[in-house]
């Protein structure tokens, strides 16, 4: 990474479940502010478009389609500020290890200058406590993929991915990432704030790169 300053803004706010149009407007409002402040990368939480957890809304094809259409609209709107946005993607890879799943993924899109520049699929799907992701999503199978902003190699991961020592972030760093961005929609727990902070600090030390950790609030 060169010495140029990279301006990164996190939109850590509420994205209600099912309110795709409302969430779209929130994202657009954030982009307008970010452009004014000359932000390089604007980060949104896990599944910011659909809200989290969307659960059985994912069984509605119209809901998935609306999520796609809005992502395309947001990409067309984007300009110099790059955005990392949580959404639901299709996962139709014939070689995928989870063929029994519905062919959708918990994903993050990277948008900039009117286009979708890249997509990351969440690899580790929690299926305990309030989490039921394995019921709906297929696992991502390209954990080491990188996203480039100018000459900076960036690894994107989603929530549970950052908890795994030999997981996506390690592969991304081995592939040359000099920064990790991890987006989340983890529920509030008064006892977990410190443990999450300690986890991210520990992973940053192990990987020897900065980690930006963004959560959703409200819901």
Each PLM stretch: what is its role?
Residues 1-219:
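Enzyme catalytic cores with a strong preference for nitrogen-chemistry domains
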């Amino acid at each position: 990474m060169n010495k140029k300053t990279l301006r990164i803004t996190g939109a850590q706010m509420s994205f209600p479940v099912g309110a795709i149009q409302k969430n779209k407007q929130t994202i657009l409002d954030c982009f307008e502010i970010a452009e004014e402040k000359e932000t390089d990368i604007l980060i949104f939480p896990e599944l910011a478009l659909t809200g989290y957890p969307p659960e059985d809304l994912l069984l509605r094809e119209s809901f998935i389609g609306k999520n796609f259409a809005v992502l395309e609209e947001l990409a067309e709107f984007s300009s110099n500020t790059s955005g990392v946005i949580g959404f639901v993607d299709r996962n139709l890879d014939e070689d995928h290890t989870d063929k029994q799943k519905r062919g959708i993924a918990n994903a993050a899109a990277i948008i900039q200058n009117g286009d979708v520049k890249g997509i990351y699929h969440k690899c580790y799907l929690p299926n305990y406590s309030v989490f039921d992701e394995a019921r709906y999503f297929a696992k991502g199978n390209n954990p080491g993929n990188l996203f480039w902003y100018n000459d900076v190699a960036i690894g994107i991961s989603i929530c549970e991915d950052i908890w795994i020592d030999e997981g996506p972030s390690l592969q991304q760093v081995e592939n040359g990432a000099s920064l990790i961005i991890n987006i989340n929609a983890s529920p509030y727990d008064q006892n977990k704030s410190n443990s999450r902070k300690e986890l991210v600090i520990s992973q940053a030390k192990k990987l020897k790169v900065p980690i930006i950790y963004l959560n959703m609030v409200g819901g």
